[in-house]
Amino acid sequence: MRNTSILCLTLAVLHTAAPAQAEEGSGPAAQAFDLADLTQLTLARVEYDSVGGMGEAYYAFEGRIWARWETDFPQAEHNLAKRLGELTRLTLVPDPARRRFTAPDLGDYPLLFMSDPGYMRYTTEEAESLRAYLQNGGFLWVDDFWGDAEWASFERFMREVLPNNHWREVPIDHPIFHTVFEFEEMPQIPARSFASRGGFTAEPAWFHRYPAGDLSRATMRGYFDSDGRLMAIGTHNTDIFDGWEREAYGSWYFERFSTQSYRMGVNVLTYVLTH
């Protein structure tokens, strides 16, 4: 394991500081990064295709049409980069990249973000490219998909990516839950539209692909290689990225949801860069 001293945080800062809230608004090997020079590190969002029409492959929100892949993009990554720059010794490029799995430079990014894959459509070439990326040291974080049907869509893709591998729930004693911040459970972050100051945090089943099943419990599900390295995670029944994107929604939202989202982001990024 590489020296993690550069990743140490002043933990009390994130816990107690009043936030200066942001405005809303055959694959290559993953590159080895020098933790002492992370100005080269850019967050990358996966661009992918989806099946269906309005409400499936794309949706209307806040006066525009969104493709599924761009949910929370680019504000989530921009805010995460900004916060990491303020609260840690990490320096990230503020503007995230967008890449398809078949991009020739995919290995330049040690961590890929992917959002809302509940209606995902993929090609064999994309599956093969992601397989090579993961087997060569890359890491995939998939977020914001709720219920059984949306998970099944992503799992079908991963069966082609890693045909001899099966997901399993990442236990709470795994290092990813403890690299910097301590978690006793996977936090459940609802989309801003369903967030409240108290009470339930699960999103409603009617808002998601049928059959949704039970959405009450958030989990982290992972794919591990033969040596036990965690290669990919799906944060299921939660929307961590929205906690970054919507931090300006209000101080109560920041305290209840964004703080937990940023803590999880710090833990995941720390884990990826040190394993």
Predicted regions span which residues?
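An acidic, glycine-rich "communication" segment
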Residues: 51-59, 150-241, 245-246, 257, ...
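Short alpha-beta junction capping motif
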Residues: 43, 111-151
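Extracytoplasmic/secreted proteins, especially bacterial periplasmic and envelope-associated proteins
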Residues: 75-79, 83, 125, 129, ...
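Aromatic-Pro/Gly-enriched surface loop or interdomain linker
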Residues: 22-111, 117-118, 239-240, 244-275
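Surface-exposed patches in mature extracellular/periplasmic domains of secreted proteins
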Residues: 90-100, 142-146, 165-173
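Loop/turn elements at helix/coil->beta-strand transitions in domains of secreted/extracellular proteins
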Residues: 39-41, 107-112, 136-139, 165-166, ...
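Bacterial N-terminal signal peptides
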Residues: 5-16
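N-terminal secretory signal peptides that target proteins for export/translocation
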Residues: 1-2
